[in-house]
């Protein structure tokens, strides 16, 4: 039974109401510093830990709760007579509920003007020590580190005479160990990122020791293939607008491949300002378009490759209305993603319960790093978030692109970044016309892209082409021009750039270079 609680929190969200409810249940309250003052100001009967232990806070608050009367009351096993006799001999009451959260270390180091001294002062010592003590003794002590658990704890206490069941205590304890591990990981990441000058402003983005923290969202039926097991984890610091923030409105459970393809679709569609639609198959765009609204964008995107769109993942950057929903519902779709769905659109899909509908709020955030496992190691790089602006382009041919061609080139370049290398993308009038992806030679990607357009009955006359990396020879350029392209955008940087540019002039097409490569593997 919970008779006495110790409360010491940095995040004071909801703590006064929680403490009031505990007091109403007859629980004695112990507290420290600012938390004790807050509770006392709210009219609650609270005992300062310094008065409880008979030992004052010292060293500017560095030593407050590191005392046998605190830790003895937390760590004593109630089922061991010798433990209880020791408490009685030393006049130590049990502490049955511990409510603690930690100094805001992560928030402190996120500030531009943070110093090493600031960071060090925000490394909590007493808090993690109490948390780990209580979590270790979770059989007898309830420990709460997350304000979101206050209501759960109160409800169970009220229902069971101030007592919580073992499963609840165990769950709360595992949450504590995860929290303290993440806290220590953040400290290690920061301290090992500092250079020889130990200056906050010159720290490395890649610490000497890298700790990553993810929380499991769900187990998956299987992995990329049925014989592989899998689970989906969410970054503890999930950025705004990220796929992991999805809310599923209907449909079957997401699979491993659903999630991977949905991420590719969502990241691509977010980059467009105009209403856009992206159709993904095996992590590659098979149709991308912008339009006056979601319905028009979908109709154009679907034209690119209706065959590959079968069973695809579709993402919109605008609300899906009834008209767009009716158009999409005519096809077999695995997952549909949008910032929102109108009520009428939801009714359309209610008749297709296997279609997974995901709502994700649009946001500018993205992952800080891109991670790739290799045998025995991990590759870590910054995200490829570079979007080339018109002023950064350099025309290298005698003929300059027309304004329309420039619009098509920028659209094509934006799509090419999300196509597996080697990537060749034909575009025109705000839509993809042919996509060549994942080939070992660039010329083969060019041929495949033109064949795709032919199969879809789309003309490439006057089209724009984007290549994710430079043309190593003129052969790839010759293929796209023969197919009908009149302008090309590519990074440049080949030892044969002069030969490729000369070929472009020979064909009287416009070519611009970005100086930026977009390999995607």
Curated annotation (Swiss-Prot):
GO terms for cellular component: cytosol. InterPro entries: AICAR_Tfase_dup_dom_sf, Cytidine_deaminase-like, MGS-like_dom, MGS-like_dom_sf, PurH-like. Transmembrane segments: none annotated. The keyword Hydrolase applies. Residues 1-145 form the MGS-like domain. Keywords: Hydrolase, Multifunctional enzyme, Purine biosynthesis, Transferase. The keyword Metal-binding does not apply. SUPFAM superfamilies: Cytidine deaminase-like (SSF53927), Methylglyoxal synthase-like (SSF52335). Its EC number is 2.1.2.3, 3.5.4.10. GO terms for molecular function: IMP cyclohydrolase activity; phosphoribosylaminoimidazolecarboxamide formyltransferase activity. PROSITE patterns: MGS. It catalyses: (6R)-10-formyltetrahydrofolate + 5-amino-1-(5-phospho-beta-D-ribosyl)imidazole-4-carboxamide = 5-formamido-1-(5-phospho-D-ribosyl)imidazole-4-carboxamide + (6S)-5,6,7,8-tetrahydrofolate; IMP + H2O = 5-formamido-1-(5-phospho-D-ribosyl)imidazole-4-carboxamide. GO terms for biological process: 'de novo' IMP biosynthetic process. It holds the Pfam family MGS. Coiled coil: none annotated. Pathway: Purine metabolism; IMP biosynthesis via de novo pathway; 5-formamido-1-(5-phospho-D-ribosyl)imidazole-4-carboxamide from 5-amino-1-(5-phospho-D-ribosyl)imidazole-4-carboxamide (10-formyl THF route): step 1/1; Purine metabolism; IMP biosynthesis via de novo pathway; IMP from 5-formamido-1-(5-phospho-D-ribosyl)imidazole-4-carboxamide: step 1/1. PANTHER family: BIFUNCTIONAL PURINE BIOSYNTHESIS PROTEIN ATIC (PTHR11692:SF0), BIFUNCTIONAL PURINE BIOSYNTHESIS PROTEIN PURH (PTHR11692). Belongs to the PurH family. The IMP cyclohydrolase activity resides in the N-terminal region. This is Bifunctional purine biosynthesis protein PurH. It comes from Burkholderia mallei (strain ATCC 23344).
């Amino acid at each position: 039974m919970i008779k006495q609680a110790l409360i010491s929190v940095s995040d004071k969200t909801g703590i006064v109401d929680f403490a009031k409810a505990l007091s109403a249940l007859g629980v004695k309250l112990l507290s420290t510093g600012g938390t004790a003052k807050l509770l006392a100001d709210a009219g609650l009967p609270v005992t300062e830990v310094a008065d409880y232990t008979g030992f004052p806070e010292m060293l500017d608050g560095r030593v407050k709760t590191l005392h046998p009367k605190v830790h003895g009351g937390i760590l004593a096993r109630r089922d061991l007579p010798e433990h209880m006799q020791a408490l009685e001999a030393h006049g130590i009451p049990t502490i049955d509920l511990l409510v603690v959260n930690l100094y805001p270390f992560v928030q402190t180091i996120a500030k531009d003007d943070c110093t090493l001294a600031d960071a060090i002062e925000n490394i909590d010592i007493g808090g993690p020590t109490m948390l780990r003590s209580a979590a270790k003794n979770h059989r007898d002590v309830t420990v709460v580190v997350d304000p979101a658990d206050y209501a759960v704890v109160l409800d169970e206490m009220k229902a069971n005479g101030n007592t919580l069941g073992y499963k609840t205590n165990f769950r709360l304890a595992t949450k504590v160990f995860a929290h303290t591990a993440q806290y220590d990981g953040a400290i290690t990441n920061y301290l090992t990122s500092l250079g020889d000058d130990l200056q906050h402003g010159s720290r490395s983005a890649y610490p000497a020791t890298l700790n990553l923290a993810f929380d499991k969202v769900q187990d998956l039926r299987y992995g990329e293939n049925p014989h592989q097991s899998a689970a989906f984890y969410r970054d503890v610091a999930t950025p705004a607008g990220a796929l992991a923030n999805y809310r599923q409105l209907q449909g079957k459970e997401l699979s491993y491949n659903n999630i991977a393809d949905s991420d590719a679709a969502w990241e691509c569609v977010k980059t467009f300002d105009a209403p856009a639609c992206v159709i993904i198959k095996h992590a590659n765009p098979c149709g991308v378009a912008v339009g006056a609204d979601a319905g028009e964008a979908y109709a154009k995107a679907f034209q690119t490759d209706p065959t590959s769109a079968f069973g695809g993942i579709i993402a919109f950057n605008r609300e899906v209305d009834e008209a767009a929903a009716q158009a999409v519902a005519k096809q077999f779709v695995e997952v549909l993603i949008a910032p929102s769905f109108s009520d009428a659109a939801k009714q359309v899909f209610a008749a297709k319960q296997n279609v997974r509908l995901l709502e994700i709020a649009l946001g500018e955030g993205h992952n800080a790093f891109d991670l790739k496992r290799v045998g025995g190691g991990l590759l870590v790089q910054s995200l490829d978030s570079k979007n080339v602006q018109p002023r950064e382009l350099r025309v290298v041919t005698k003929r300059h692109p027309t304004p329309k061609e420039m619009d098509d080139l920028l659209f094509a370049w934006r799509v090419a970044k999300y196509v597996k290398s080697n990537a060749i993308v034909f575009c025109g009038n705000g839509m993809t016309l042919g996509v060549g992806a994942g080939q070992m030679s660039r010329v083969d990607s060019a041929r495949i892209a033109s064949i795709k357009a032919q199969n879809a009955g789309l003309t490439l006359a006057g089209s724009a082409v984007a290549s994710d990396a430079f043309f190593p020879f003129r052969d790839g350029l010759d293929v796209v021009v023969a197919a009908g392209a009149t302008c090309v955008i590519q990074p440049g940087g080949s030892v044969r750039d002069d030969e490729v540019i000369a070929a472009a002039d020979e064909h009287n097409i416009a070519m611009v270079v970005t100086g930026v490569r977009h390999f995607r593997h």
